[in-house]
């Protein structure tokens, strides 16, 4: 059966810092867990585009999206999505993505990198310290390989 409509959940941040356009890790865990327990399947961008064009998708479908490409998407969102077999579409600001090795995430245990709130992230980027707030290409590759995130470009600054 085809879904009559598909909910779209849009996030920027999953961080203990919280904020207006953020979910805390506990809230994000609860939301994704509830979707998974209810039998929802997360869609890819191509599946959602096909649905918008009249194509069929499972009755319990959801599109989970993230904007910009913040470090906390790797640190806190990636492990939750992996744990529940869900995926999200991340629209990156490619000019803010950096190089370097993969940093720790919450699914590994041990110390985690700081994941500041939205305003602090904007300040870090403006100060030329984007690596403290944004993803690295190595983390993008790891999330893509794990199947937790699909990446599209939002903009290049």
Where are these regions (language model features)?
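Active-site beta->alpha N-cap acidic-glycine motif
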Residues: 5-6, 16-29, 34-36, 41-148
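Short beta-strand segments
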Residues: 8-11, 92, 152-153
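Conserved small/polar residues in nucleotide/adenosyl-binding loops
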Residues: 155-157
């Amino acid at each position: 059966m085809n879904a009559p409509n598909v909910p779209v959940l849009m996030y920027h941040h999953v961080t203990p810092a919280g904020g207006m356009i953020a979910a805390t890790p506990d809230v994000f865990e609860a939301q994704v867990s509830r979707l998974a327990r209810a039998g929802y399947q997360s869609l890819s961008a191509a599946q959602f585009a096909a649905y918008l064009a009249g194509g069929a998708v499972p009755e319990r479908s959801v599109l989970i999206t993230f904007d910009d490409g913040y470090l906390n998407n790797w640190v806190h969102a990636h492990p939750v999505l992996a744990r529940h077999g869900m995926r999200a579409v991340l629209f990156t600001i490619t000019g803010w993505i950096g190089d370097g090795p993969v940093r720790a995430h919450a699914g590994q245990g041990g110390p985690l990198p700081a994941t500041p709130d939205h305003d602090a992230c904007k300040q870090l980027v403006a100060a030329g310290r984007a690596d403290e707030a944004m993803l690295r290409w190595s983390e993008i590759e790891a999330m893509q390989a794990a199947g937790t995130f699909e990446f599209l470009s939002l903009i290049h600054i």
